[in-house]
Design a protein with these regions (language model features):
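C-terminal interaction modules of eukaryotic adaptor/scaffold proteins
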Residues: 504-505, 510-568
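Alpha-helical solenoid repeat scaffolds, predominantly canonical TPR units
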Residues: 25, 60, 111, 146, ...
Length: 568
């Protein structure tokens, strides 16, 4: 008996029984090796869908997608000439949902487009699930296009808009996000706390904390009650912008409103105290957190360990790591990276390397951050052989050196006057497909200037324009200082004026060195003009420069300038 005939007999049996029994017959035939036809599969899907058995239909489709049930149905459904007797909308809806659940973005889109082409529209739940998948998969532009194409056809709800607003905020498209907020109201829907919290969080992450504050106030006018996450993201936003008073006030407002701070809120507070060097206050908040019964995760401990390391309290930091183990948590790679960074900062490379070996033996894998931290540590203590050994090891672990890795090495070789080696690292960086940035060039130029190689430094400086890179204030000040050391007052003054015309303010050292060199070269008028420029920039001349200027004024015959003017 042929497979198609067996499938036909199966259909005749399934049509006589309820869908649950029909599915059992279908599965039994599958396990016995029956090669289903598109008609037998279409029948059981239609039988399940028409009875409202969506989960069972979706499970069956997932088996088709994975190949556990061999069939050409999925391919045939996308062919225009294939028209089986099915309830199309539920079928396509279920297929799209199945692909979404299996994270098959392209296939989900294929069936969605075919569904629309056939004149069918997905249900709200399917549409929302697909939008979520697209945004999580970094396909925001596709999600935006589909949303606008179907917004007048699909029954949208507040969740639909919330998904898209979150996508806008994550992609930095705030104009679109606020346009969606207005559109939501045009559709007769009311924005909820989650939508406003999403917008507040987005504004804070992109530095517009005042707009976030306005949204928070608008929530109050609308009668929306902020949740712990709303307070936390705004509090964190204030802290990130250096607005400590506002951040702490937000924390107090949260408690006054009767809302118990969550772990995120406490972590923000602890982090702010640690960043400000107030580790004792951070530990008081930590104690309060535990008293309130809020679970302290590894992240909380990592923040405190980082604060202790920045305060050079390494003994306490190590004790806290041991405490992490005692409370049933495990130090993660971030914990080790913080400790390694702390010990590298103070040149304790033996301890840093011991921690590095410890993390590997505990089953953790070093990250690019781990290697860069250790390479920077070795470079700081001038152990370039150790740094290069680590580069070799990271490559063996299939971790490619990054722009930061190469910049650290270039800086180290240039500072130690290994110019050829620094240039070799620069060349390797470009060969690996990485594009050096202004900071990379600044460390190379700095190394050349420090060792008096102004000819090469000047060539590199001029090449920045050819690469469409704008020199920053660090590069200008470095070059000016280099020319002053060389005794070239003309070049130093020219660069200083160029820097000012570019909208940058030279630092005190650049002004002082150039004025001193001009005086040495008896270019009194230029020195006096530059001094006036320095004072007008809001910079204070040093005592030695003050005395030098008096000498300049005596030579020029100008005795009218008051000491007060010099000290302003």
């Amino acid at each position: 008996m042929s497979q198609s005939h067996e499938a036909l007999i199966l259909i005749q049996k399934m049509v006589k029984v309820p869908p649950t029994k029909a599915l059992l017959l279908f599965n039994t035939a599958t396990y016995q090796g029956l090669q289903h036809t598109s008609h037998s599969i279409s029948f059981i899907l239609n039988h399940l869908l028409s009875s409202g058995m969506l989960p069972q239909a979706q499970s069956l489709i997932l088996r088709l997608i994975s190949g556990r049930i061999p069939s050409s149905l999925m391919l045939q459904l996308t062919q225009a000439h294939f028209t089986p007797c099915l309830t199309y909308t539920p079928l396509y809806d279920t297929i799209v949902n199945a692909y979404v659940h299996s994270h098959s973005t392209d296939q989900a889109l294929t069936f969605l487009h075919h569904m629309i082409h056939e004149g069918h529209v997905p249900l709200s739940n399917t549409f929302n699930n697909l939008m979520c998948l697209l945004i999580r998969s970094n396909y925001f532009d596709k999600a935006w296009w589909i949303f606008n194409e179907l917004k007048s056809k699909v029954v949208l709800d507040a969740y639909s808009f919330g998904i898209m607003i979150k996508g806008c905020c994550e992609a930095g498209y705030f104009v679109k996000g606020f346009r969606l907020l207005a559109m939501l109201e045009e559709f007769g829907l009311s924005p909820n706390v989650v939508i406003y919290t999403t917008l507040i969080d987005g504004c804070c992450k992109y530095g517009n904390v005042m707009l976030a504050k306005n949204l928070f106030c608008k929530m109050d006018r609308l009668g929306l009650v902020p949740n712990p996450h709303t307070y936390s993201v705004l509090m964190n936003g204030f802290f990130k912008q250096g607005l400590q008073r506002e951040g702490f006030q937000m924390y107090e407002n949260m408690k006054r409103s009767g809302i118990v701070p969550n772990a995120y809120a406490y972590n923000c507070l602890i982090s702010e105290y640690c960043n400000g060097g107030m580790v004792d206050k951070a530990f008081k908040v930590f104690a309060e957190m535990r008293e309130k019964g809020i679970a302290c995760g590894v992240m909380t401990y990592n923040i405190l360990i980082g604060g202790l390391c920045r305060g050079k309290k390494f003994g306490e930091a190590v004790k806290l790591v041991h405490k992490v183990n005692k409370v049933g948590l495990s130090p993660n790679i971030v914990t080790y990276n913080i400790l390694i960074n702390g010990f590298c900062d103070v040149g304790k490379m033996d301890t840093a390397v011991r921690l590095f070996n410890q993390l590997k033996s505990s089953g953790l894998s070093p990250t690019l951050v781990t290697y860069n931290t250790l390479i920077a540590g070795y470079s700081k203590v001038e152990n370039l052989a150790g740094a290069l050994d680590l580069v070799k090891e990271m490559e063996e672990r299939c971790i490619a050196p990054s722009k930061v890795t190469y910049t650290i090495l270039i800086d180290a070789f240039a500072r130690l006057n290994y110019t050829e080696k620094a240039c070799e690292m620069h060349s390797l960086m470009e060969k690996s497909g990485l594009v050096p940035d202004v900071y990379t060039y600044s460390v190379l130029i700095h190394g050349l200037c420090v060792h008096g190689n102004m000819k090469e430094a000047s060539k590199l400086f001029k090449s920045l324009g050819e690469m469409h890179l704008q020199p920053n204030s660090v590069i200008y000040n470095t070059m000016i200082h280099g020319y002053c050391k060389e005794g070239s007052s003309y070049r130093a003054l020219r660069l200083l004026n160029e820097m000012v015309h570019s909208g940058m303010v030279p630092n005190v050292a650049s002004f002082c060195s150039t004025i001193g060199l001009l005086c040495r070269d008896e270019k009194w008028k230029e020195a006096e003009l530059l001094l006036g420029q320095m004072i007008n920039s809001g910079l204070k001349p040093s005592v030695s420069l003050y005395k030098m200027v008096h000498k300049v004024k005596e030579i020029l015959g100008f005795h009218g300038m008051k000491p007060k003017e010099m000290r302003s």
